[in-house]
Amino acid sequence: MNALTEMKCEACQADAPKVTDAELAELVGMIPDWGVEIRDGIMQLERVYKFKNFKLAMAFTNKLADLAEAEFHHPGILTEWGKVTVTWWSHSIKGLHKNDFIMAAKTDQLLD
């Protein structure tokens, strides 16, 4: 179990601080299967999940949708045959907040 999965997302306003470099290094270590990507100057977390078919990929996507609604924090999701690409970032601050790491860990937990 990951300590991040026990945490809840907090409301993230436009003036909320992005994670620092030190926090980034620590938090990334807690979600080793995730990569850090920069798109349009915005740092994001991304992971590709593999499945045996489209139906399983879609079932995972639906579980993730339920989780996102419960936490009121929503990812980018690309569902394809046999895989789901999930991208977390905080839109309001155009970067990474601790919420994104919490949600990445909780997304991983959906596989259990």
From Swiss-Prot:
Keywords: Lyase. It comes from the Bacteria. Belongs to the pterin-4-alpha-carbinolamine dehydratase family. GO terms for molecular function: 4-alpha-hydroxytetrahydrobiopterin dehydratase activity. This is Putative pterin-4-alpha-carbinolamine dehydratase. Pfam families: Pterin_4a (PF01329). It catalyses: (4aS,6R)-4a-hydroxy-L-erythro-5,6,7,8-tetrahydrobiopterin = (6R)-L-erythro-6,7-dihydrobiopterin + H2O. One of its GO terms (biological process) is tetrahydrobiopterin biosynthetic process. Its EC number is 4.2.1.96. It comes from Shewanella frigidimarina (strain NCIMB 400). HAMAP family: Pterin_4_alpha. The lineage of its organism: Bacteria, Pseudomonadati, Pseudomonadota, Gammaproteobacteria, Alteromonadales.
